[in-house]
């Protein structure tokens, strides 16, 4: 089997050209090396060939929001690992620890042309934990990672309200208050770390060792030796997880359907000077011009199917078009398992 693959005379659709065009595609070791109307030469002669004449050829799709690998296909409770219902604020959770590459949804994704997904916690929690970006093929999630921590999931609206009434989350006011409280505590925690002279580059183990003052002197750098341990705050996994958000290194990823929830997400992001991505954006067509002015990227969908709750009543395929026309940066998402990854065209 050759290291080269030639996809010959396919009708290519991409994100650059407005119209499809016919060309050859040369692939080397799984990566596209060259595209031209006709490719010739020794390498071409040695390549494995797929005759794509009359066949549409697309780049692999990237799904910016789903729960693939955390919500098993036809597994019921045994595979439901995308919502942690013990606490409404769980930033310390990491999606990569729950992804099951052996789940059937990965094969479905490949069948649908989806080659990379951003997958992570659901929307039960005010703060749900970090998403990860992974390839949709492989046996071990560590080898499939594109990026281990892409964004911090937060949620507004009906889902956190419905899940945590017994823990005092009855209203949208409470959802917003809990988010503000966590971000404020993270800012205070960060301030204390800076006051103690703590290097920002420390990983969690180094941080925990330093706070327990058990780091061996031979392990310390010059920067480590400048740390004032008497000023170090007690190690807090939740606050550690929120530091990249507060420092502008990781965006918030906000589940928001209703227009007022979208505005609340934007309001809080601007209050704390943090980055933001908006998911679902169901009422986006109603406020498209405003969203374009704000400039935060929006992920829309899935738009296919019945409105299963009140905040979905404006869902429809008109939404991404209206947002794009207004000038927003738009992606269309499956929210898998809501829409299976093998059917991205339905989103």
PLM features per residue range, with description:
Residues 73-74, 80-85, 90-93, 251, ...:
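His/Asp/Glu-enriched, well-ordered alpha-helical/loop segment
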Residues 69-71, 101, 123-127, 259-263, ...:
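Active-site environment of divalent metal-dependent phosphoester hydrolases
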Residues 62-64, 117, 152, 252-254, ...:
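Hydrophobic faces of well-ordered beta-strands that scaffold small-molecule active sites
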Residues 110-276:
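Polyanionic/metal-chelating signatures
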Residues 233-235, 254-258, 279-282, 308-316:
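A general structural motif
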Residues 1-44, 55:
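N-terminal metal-binding scaffold of metallo-dependent hydrolase/deaminase domains
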Residues 10, 25, 30, 54, ...:
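Divalent metal-coordination and catalytic microenvironments
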Residues 55-121, 125-126:
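Metal-associated gating/positioning segment near the N- to mid-region
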């Amino acid at each position: 089997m050759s290291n080269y693959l030639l996809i010959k005379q396919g009708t290519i659709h991409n994100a650059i050209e407005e119209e499809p065009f016919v060309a050859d595609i040369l692939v080397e070791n799984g990566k596209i090396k060259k595209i031209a109307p006709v490719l010739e030469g020794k390498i071409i002669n040695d390549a494995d060939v797929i005759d794509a004449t009359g066949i549409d050829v697309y780049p692999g799709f990237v799904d910016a929001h789903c729960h693939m690998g955390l919500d098993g296909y036809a597994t019921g409770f045994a595979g439901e690992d995308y919502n942690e219902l013990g606490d409404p604020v769980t930033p310390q959770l990491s999606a990569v620890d729950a992804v099951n590459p052996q789940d059937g949804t990965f094969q479905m994704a490949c069948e649908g042309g989806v080659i990379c997904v951003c997958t992570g916690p659901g929307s039960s929690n005010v703060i749900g934990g970090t998403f990860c970006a992974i390839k949709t093929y492989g046996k071990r999630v560590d080898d499939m990672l594109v990026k281990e921590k892409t964004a911090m999931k937060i949620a507004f609206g009906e889902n956190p309200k419905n899940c945590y009434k017994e823990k005092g989350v009855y209203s949208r006011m409470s959802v917003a208050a809990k988010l503000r409280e966590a971000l404020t505590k993270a800012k205070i925690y960060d301030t204390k770390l800076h006051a103690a002279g703590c290097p920002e580059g420390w990983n969690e183990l180094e941080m925990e060792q330093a706070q327990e003052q058990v780091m061996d002197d031979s392990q310390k750098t010059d920067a480590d030796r400048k740390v004032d341990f008497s000023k170090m705050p007690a190690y807090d996994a939740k606050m550690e997880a929120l530091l990249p958000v507060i420092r502008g290194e990781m965006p918030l990823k906000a589940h928001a359907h209703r227009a007022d929830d979208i505005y609340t997400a934007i309001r809080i992001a601007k209050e704390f000077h943090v980055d933001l991505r908006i998911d679902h954006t169901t009422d986006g067509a109603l406020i498209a011009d405003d969203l374009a002015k704000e400039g935060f990227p929006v992920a829309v969908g899935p738009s296919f199917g019945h409105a299963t709750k009140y905040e979905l009543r404006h869902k429809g395929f008109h939404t991404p078009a209206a947002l794009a026309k207004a000038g927003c940066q738009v992606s269309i998402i499956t929210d898998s398992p809501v829409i299976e990854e093998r059917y991205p065209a339905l989103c």
